């Protein structure tokens, strides 16, 4: 029997780590050395964006200090590494790298048959209220990159041009909400991922399931059915229920404690909803409904 490889393709700031930790605690899939190895993303860039792969290696990846960080990564090496992370008492291993949501459809189509030959691959993507999720991510970047001297190693900027860019952003946008609104006006795939495009790209795999964060924390039974493993409850997360700056301080989620630097007003939420109407429409066209929690302002 093949081990399970459970791949989660984003979206960040949607309780991805509590999702992975729940699957670990319930004896389904081990997280391996880390929940986010970013191996597939680095491999993708090595093949399709070699110049940026070198930049990513020099400024981020090689500084992570883990056993899986290899400059000459291959898909074969990824397979062997993930198999080595399967532990007794678990059905398989998970890869919850949020960068999986940034892989191109071409690359995903290329690796799908290779991975499915070696693993029983299950793919999820977890999505949260689009307006609130976008603010949490953009606010977190604003917080960590405009005050980069006081961050942990994972947020350190090692590129002088990038440092200047964020210094200029701080000068232009005095707080996180003003910067967030500027990004809503010209949405990038990184800050505002199109959920449907991510789902379509990963649908080349045989087993794919979109997880709505608010729904699964209310009732995980549909998730249990998809993975074929009983999940009776989800671990606590910072974003459910939504509490903005008053979210709980869960020890292993310290990066998310202060992701929301400010509380969004009703007017802010309405503006965000209008700006992201295209995302809601795409979701409705694909899935035939909008989660009621996403319309709460």
Residue ranges and their predicted role:
Residues 15-26, 107-113, 137-140, 188-189, ...:
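PAPS/PAP-binding and catalytic site of the sulfotransferase fold
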Residues 64-65, 95-102, 175-191, 260-268:
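Surface-exposed cleft-lining segments at the edges of enzyme active sites
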Residues 66-73, 100-106, 214-218:
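Acidic-and-aromatic substrate-binding clefts and catalytic sites of carbohydrate-active enzymes
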Residues 103-125:
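ATP-dependent NMP and nucleoside kinases share a basic, alpha-helical "lid"
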Residues 72-86, 147-225, 272-282:
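PAPS-dependent sulfotransferase catalytic domain
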Residues 1-91, 95-97, 136, 141-169, 225-286:
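PAPS-dependent sulfotransferase catalytic core
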């Amino acid at each position: 029997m093949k081990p399970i490889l459970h791949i989660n393709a984003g979206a960040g700031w949607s309780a991805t780590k509590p999702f992975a930790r729940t699957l670990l605690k319930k004896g389904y899939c081990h997280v391996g050395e880390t929940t986010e190895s970013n191996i597939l993303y680095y491999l993708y860039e090595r093949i399709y964006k070699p110049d940026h792969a070198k930049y990513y290696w020099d400024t981020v990846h090689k500084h992570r200090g883990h056993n899986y960080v290899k400059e000459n990564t291959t898909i074969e090496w990824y397979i062997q590494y993930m198999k080595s992370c399967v532990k007794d008492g678990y059905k398989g291993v998970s890869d919850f790298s949020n960068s999986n949501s940034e892989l191109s459809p071409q690359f995903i189509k290329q690796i799908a048959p290779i991975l499915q030959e070696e693993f029983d691959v299950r793919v999820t993507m977890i999505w949260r209220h689009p307006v609130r999720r976008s603010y949490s991510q953009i606010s977190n970047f604003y917080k960590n990159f405009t005050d980069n001297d006081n961050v942990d190693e994972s947020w350190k900027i090692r590129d002088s041009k990038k440092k200047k860019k964020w210094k200029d952003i701080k000068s232009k946008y005095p707080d996180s909400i003003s910067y967030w609104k500027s990004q809503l006006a010209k949405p990038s795939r990184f800050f505002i991922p199109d959920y449907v495009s991510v789902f379509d790209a990963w649908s080349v795999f045989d087993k794919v399931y979109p997880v709505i964060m608010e729904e699964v924390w209310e009732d995980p039974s549909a998730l249990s059915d998809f993975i074929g493993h009983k999940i009776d409850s989800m671990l606590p997360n910072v974003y459910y229920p939504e509490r903005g700056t008053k979210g709980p301080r869960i020890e292993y989620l310290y990066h998310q404690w202060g992701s929301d630097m400010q509380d969004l007003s009703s007017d802010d939420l309405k503006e965000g909803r209008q700006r992201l109407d295209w995302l809601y429409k795409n979701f409705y066209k694909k899935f035939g409904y909008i989660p009621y929690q996403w319309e709460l302002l």
